[in-house]
Amino acid sequence: MDLQAINSNFKNFLEEVGSYYSVVDDQEVQILRKKQDDCYQNFLDVHYEYTKCISQIDDKYSSLNKTFKFKTEKAAKSYKSCLQNKKVEECHERTWKHLHENMKQYISLLRRIDTQTIKY
């Protein structure tokens, strides 16, 4: 065998080996890319659920705060109208009783929302 034939055979061998490794690399890269895409999709799904949950919790806090503000304003108006007809002590006691009940409900609902937040 002459030197040119040996070089040609060796070159063909290297190309064959190279093509084998490029196929293996391509397959491994495709597998890794698939895993990466799956992970990214899972991340997007989890992120979407988390964002949706946070939005719902924000809505609940907002609604709860509006309700509490409304009840507090209602109690203040009730206190003013009460003062026109009754003694200050009687109005004061009645108003504080309403405000205390409102505050207990508010705290109870806040705890319930916080419990839901912890679940996520």
Model-derived regions, located:
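Mitochondrial intermembrane space
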Residues: M1-Y120
